[in-house]
Amino acid sequence: MKILSLYCGAGGLDEGLKQAGFKTTLAIDINKDACETMKLNHDCEVINGKVSDYESSFGDFDIIIGGPPCPEFSRANKNRTFNSCEVDLFWSIVDRIKPSFYMMENVQDVIRVVNRDNYLVNVSDYGVAQDRLRRIFTNLPLPKSRNKKTLYDVLGNTGFDYLTDFAFPNRNQKCPSRNMSEISMTLTTMKHFYLTSIPIYTRKYLPKEKHVWLNKDKTSLTNGKPCREITHKERAMIQGFPEDYVFYGNDVSIRKQIGNAVPPPLANAFFSQIQIPITVLNKGNAK
């Protein structure tokens, strides 16, 4: 089956289809880093450009997916104006090509300008460890709720030895010259080390009293359970990406790619329902 992925971003929808047994044929996005991420994870043709510049060249496809960027509808945008932005272009392509299946994902308020069959879903019902409402436009039926997960289910076994893909690349190493499972009984030689990296099972060696280092350039430990920022890998796993999914770009770019992505388990839940008709299979094999 031929699959067209419009506004593919980091490939959340594509990964969901992949897990359901499908493979994207052509993907397009205006963001260069997102396109590189797609290339690293999906064996398909990827175009870095505007959908409007290529729409007339799109031929027949069996499935069309996409998540058009529409910040006008985001509730985080306090100056919202309800224009149709890229969604009209998405639907014009769907209406022209007439694929067997289609799916558009967006924020819930996009319903104000789109009069199509849709579902308002909470991604937590489909194996994503988030309470997040999304609007899904598709000709597929609403899948049953499945695989509810907590953050512990997703991140509980991520381990400690190395904080790979940490937001700051110079902070992902173990404590210099010693294993953190055998940390010093005192903090004299570790005073300026990043204490937020110390795992729970070794914190018994830390001073019991609470204390703070009032220096903006030094680590501050205020209680027995210091918190660190989650890594990019952990952010992606919370979105439902597999642990080995690779993201391309700098810190800010990767954060945006992960945050804007459609959770793969959501797409997987919808497309794993497809029982492909023989006529569709023959149509796909003939191309």
Regions found by a protein language model. Name each.
Residues M1-L4:
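Extreme N-terminal starter segment of soluble prokaryotic enzymes
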Residues D53-I63, P68-V212:
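Class I S-adenosyl-L-methionine
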Residues K32-E36:
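Short alpha-helix immediately C-terminal to the canonical SAM-binding loop
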